[in-house]
């Protein structure tokens, strides 16, 4: 990876991708979960108040020399909740070793994948009754959240608070929520953040009973279309092991990665 610890431009060789803009998009998405508290500057962090690590954490600290102090601040600001520290191409080189030295353990990594939006992907065949809809209204948003939270394995009982945080995001003007709907019921989800010239694609989830039927491909193709309709140049996402082959088939290539750290249990 090409680090850009000062927030300046960092280009992935051979792809023409500005990683600084990709990570700015990802930071916007994650910081948008900071309903209880968020901070930017010496420590970019977000606290949703939800008792699940996906929605509390640290996105970066700009200085390698300040990692120890930043880790102490993160422990204080995120106390009482599970959280993750995301180490990506916008983090100073050497951050993983410093986090380990200050007691955090590595959980794993996720690839960062991108593709240009100068052409759209083929969605493939879909069930005749499957529709892609933009999510509007509190009832549909609640169903949307229930669908992806169940797929993510988030503990039950958090859906109402998650929907509240989603509805109150300060960047909702940049957000497009797309649902795969079959017979009136949401069976798949994705969220697009159209910002910093990129369509960040998040929360691509399909209900367990409808997987391996092409729904994820249809959703991702719709997300690409939404990004291009909003004038974005590239699409970017963080891929799970199960999703990476699907995204490669849609023209995405891996340009970097995020490494995830957490406090020991």
Predicted regions and their residues:
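Conserved acetyl-CoA-binding loop-helix of GNAT-fold acetyltransferases
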Residues: 67-75, 203-208, 212-225, 229, ...
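N-terminal charged segments
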Residues: 1-80, 91
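Conserved acetyl-CoA binding element of GNAT-fold acetyltransferases
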Residues: 53-63, 197-208
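A short, well-structured alpha-helix characteristic of acyl/acetyltransferase catalytic modules
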Residues: 137-150
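Acyl-donor-binding surface of acyltransferase catalytic domains
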Residues: 63-139, 239, 261-263
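A conserved beta-strand-loop-helix scaffold within acyl/acetyltransferase catalytic domains
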Residues: 157-207
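Conserved beta-hairpin
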Residues: 36-40, 91, 97-102, 174-190
């Amino acid at each position: 990876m090409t680090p850009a610890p000062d927030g300046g431009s960092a280009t992935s060789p051979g792809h023409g991708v500005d990683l600084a803009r990709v990570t700015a998009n990802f930071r916007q998405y994650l910081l948008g979960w900071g309903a209880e508290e968020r901070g930017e500057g010496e420590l970019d962090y977000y606290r949703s108040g939800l008792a699940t690590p996906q929605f509390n954490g640290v996105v970066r600290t700009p200085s390698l020399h300040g990692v120890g102090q930043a880790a102490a601040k993160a422990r204080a600001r995120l106390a009482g909740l599970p959280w993750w520290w995301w180490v990506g191409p916008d983090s100073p080189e050497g951050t993983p070793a410093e986090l380990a030295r200050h007691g955090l353990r590595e959980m794993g990594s996720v690839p960062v994948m991108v593709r240009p939006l100068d052409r759209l992907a083929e969605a493939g065949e879909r069930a005749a009754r499957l529709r892609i809809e933009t999510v509007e209204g509190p009832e549909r948003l609640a169903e949307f959240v229930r669908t992806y939270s169940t797929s993510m394995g988030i503990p039950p009982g958090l859906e109402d608070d998650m929907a509240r945080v989603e509805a109150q995001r300060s960047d909702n003007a940049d957000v497009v929520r797309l649902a795969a709907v079959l017979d009136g019921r949401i069976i798949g989800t994705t969220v697009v953040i159209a910002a910093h010239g990129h369509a960040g694609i998040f929360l691509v989830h399909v209900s367990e009973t409808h997987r391996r039927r092409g729904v994820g491909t249809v959703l991702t193709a719709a997300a690409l279309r939404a990004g291009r309709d909003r004038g974005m140049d590239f699409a970017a996402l963080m891929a799970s092991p199960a999703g990476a082959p699907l995204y490669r088939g849609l023209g995405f290539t891996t340009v970097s990665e995020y490494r995830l750290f957490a406090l020991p249990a």
